[in-house]
Design a protein with these regions (language model features):
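Secondary-structure transition/capping motifs at alpha-helix termini
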Residues: 1-2, 35-42, 63, 67, ...
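Cys/His-rich short segments
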Residues: 114-167, 171
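Intrinsic disorder at enzyme termini
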Residues: 469, 473-542
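A glycine-rich helix N-cap at a beta->alpha junction
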Residues: 76-88
């Protein structure tokens, strides 16, 4: 039976669509999950969404929808992003799932019956965006110490969790084990929250209704942290019959989360488990933030980075690599478009991409793609072979400890050494004399072996591109197995290479920065009470120039070169026309066929991804979604819209 490994991301709060900051934790966990699977572990990788709370309730009310309708749309975008970024999660939990609700109600009741939860009155400060209560002494300049926003007075009946009874136990747990990483976080928790006096935690609310009801006191809903944290065990079947592998996977091998919620995962969560007499998780890694141009990302600041844009322009693996490469262990990192593009060019296009393309091209040019089996070694080979042979042992603990940036450094040291080895051995000079063929074959074989080892260790980080590398260098699945990565000389002596595409094309940084700034510029929302002059007034004569007509969509298909464009055939009662529209992210072709629409009939033809477009559909920008204006099915095609 294989050893098990259970790791989790935090469950994300779907108050808005995901951005690059959400991607760091998820890609970091996905990398570890893939690496442990390479090692032969039975992995359970959990992610999901934390969907209750006052903030969600308020945002849903603003949009005129129910909280469940509000989160459903955003959760779908999270899942779409994880699919785009090749996240190999095993389970996705939503706190609105029935089985999770059942577990939370049982846990709350059990803790109440054991005397760990009691009823009282909460008086203090509350931050709605963070869903956090604070004492006056914890505020920074009178504002929330986590997000810096205004707090409000709260005074309501509530249930409390007796954290104070476990102050000594939790301090001992944090200081005498290696649970919380990096170690600097331990001092933060002990000095800021435990030593000043660990306070009991408010765990229910009566001032809003969007939450899990306390089944023995219906006017209360379970407050965020008992609800959210319990996902790590409800997803395994604890307290419900949905799953039955709690005994198999618990305790968790690693929880990973951003530093702002380390307090709840390092203090509240272990205490809840102690109260339930359950084993404690083995490790918690609290990573830093990705800042954009030196400032923490925030939708309210308009500085979030859209990962869909980056993945479409530069490839998923380049984005996965970059966001892990520049995050120092336990510290914040600064994300800028220029840094990202420079990193892609330097590491992926120049170092890795050139190493693969040059090596494969030389094997193809000098030996027709298949190396001869004769070999002549030289002292020049020893350092490269030694570095490649020991790389797996060096990188393994780094990946297991979420030190992904350091793991990348070690791998690219070997890649850089291999590029230097090409210059030292000068294969193009050896190729001029047939008597050097055995030596030339040795040099190329050493390069192919180095690429095999490096690409296999990079595959958890870049799972889509590395199989292409293996195909080019003639490596089979057995050649890149984990148990072969500490051995040099695994490829067949007469290995055959196969030239392929350029894996990471070089980027024109200056022009790309301009384009990214345009694509990621925050949309300006014109409020109803703004002066219309600001939006631009047109005359009736100008408006009369626009010819609007009705039509029926008779056929629709995706354009292969784009993730955003659909090619639409419209019956306009005048012979038909083709319209290309950027709505593929919001509608499938099947949803549109047969729909009656309004289109601009006298728009000049335009070429989009090689397809001619003769018109434009009418649609409205509905917040996070674009909605096409559909007409009644009985509307005649070709009618003029007045």
């Amino acid at each position: 039976m294989n050893k098990t490994y259970y790791l989790t991301t935090p469950i994300y709060y779907p108050s808005g669509n995901p951005h690059i900051g959400h991607c760091y934790t998820t890609v970091a966990c996905d990398t570890i999950a893939r690496f442990k699977r390479m090692q032969g572990y039975d992995v359970m990788f959990l992610t999901g969404t934390d969907e209750h709370g006052q903030k969600i309730e308020l945002k849903a009310a603003e949009k005129g929808v129910t909280p469940k309708e509000y989160v459903d749309e955003i959760v779908a975008n999270f899942k779409r992003l994880w699919e785009t970024m090749h996240i190999s999660y095993d389970r996705f939990i939503r706190t609105t799932d029935d089985y999770h609700i059942e577990t939370v109600q049982k846990i709350f009741k059990k803790l109440y019956e054991k005397g760990y939860i009691y009823k009282g009155t909460y008086k203090g400060k509350y931050c709605t965006p963070c869903e956090s209560f604070w004492t006056e002494s914890q505020l920074v300049d009178g504002k929330c110490p986590d997000c810096g926003r205004e707090v409000k007075e709260a005074n309501e009946e509530a249930y409390f969790l007796r954290l104070s009874d476990f102050a000594d136990k939790i301090e001992k747990f944090l200081t005498e084990t290696d649970y919380l990483q990096p170690k600097s976080r331990v001092n933060e928790m002990v000095n800021n929250f435990i030593k000043p006096g660990l306070e009991d935690l408010c765990v229910s609310r009566t001032s809003f209704t969007w939450g899990i009801p306390v089944d023995f006191d219906s006017k209360h809903v379970v407050y965020v942290w008992v609800d959210a944290l319990s996902n790590y065990i409800s997803a395994l079947g604890y307290g419900n019959e949905k799953y039955n592998d709690f005994e198999k996977y618990w305790p968790a091998d690693m929880h990973m989360t951003a530093k702002e919620i380390v307090r709840f995962h390092s203090i509240v969560w272990p205490i809840i488990l102690m109260m339930l007499d359950l084993p404690l998780p083995k490790h918690l890694y609290g990573h830093g933030w990705i800042n954009f141009n030196g400032d923490k990302m925030s939708k309210s600041k308009g500085n979030v980075v859209d990962p869909f844009v980056l993945c479409e322009r530069y490839g998923v693996d380049a984005v996965r690599y970059q966001i892990l490469r520049d995050m120092p262990y336990g510290s914040d990192c600064n994300f800028t478009n220029e840094l990202m593009l420079t990193r892609i060019n330097a590491d992926l296009a120049n170092d890795l991409g050139n190493l693969v393309s040059r090596t494969v091209a030389m094997a193809d040019k000098y030996f027709g793609g298949t190396l001869p089996t004769d070999r002549v070694s030289d002292e020049l080979d020893n350092q490269l072979i030694g570095m490649a042979q020991s790389l797996c042992d060096t990188v393994t603990p780094l990946i297991e400890q979420a030190q992904h940036s350091k793991a990348h450094e070690e791998i690219f040291k070997v890649i850089s050494r291999a590029n230097k080895y090409i210059d030292e051995t000068a294969p193009w000079v050896l190729a001029k004399d047939e008597s050097n063929n055995a030596r030339l074959a040795t040099v190329l074989y050493n390069l192919l072996e180095t690429i095999r080892i490096c690409s296999a260790l990079l595959s958890p980080f870049m799972p889509a591109t590395m199989p292409e590398v293996w195909e080019q260098i003639g490596a089979g699945a057995e050649d890149t197995a984990f148990d072969k990565l500490g051995t040099f000389g695994v490829l067949r002596a007469d290995v055959t290479v196969k030239k392929g595409r350029v894996l990471f094309p070089r980027i024109d940084i200056k022009s790309e920065i301009t384009e990214l700034e345009r694509l990621m510029k925050p949309k300006t929302v014109i409020k109803e009470d703004e002066d219309l002059d600001k939006a631009g007034i047109i005359s009736i004569d100008d408006f009369a120039k626009v010819k609007l007509r009705t039509g029926e969509i008779t056929a629709c298909e995706k354009i292969k070169k784009s993730k955003k464009l659909l090619k639409i055939q419209v019956d306009d009662a005048r012979g038909g026309r083709q319209i290309v529209s950027g709505i593929a992210e919001y509608y499938t072709p099947e949803e549109l066929i047969g729909k009656k629409i309004i289109f601009v009939a006298n728009l000049a033809p335009a070429k989009l991804c090689g397809e001619e477009s003769n018109g434009m559909l009418l649609a409205c920008d509905a917040g996070e979604k674009v909605q096409v204006v559909f007409l009644d099915k009985d509307t005649p095609n070709g009618s003029t819209v007045r």
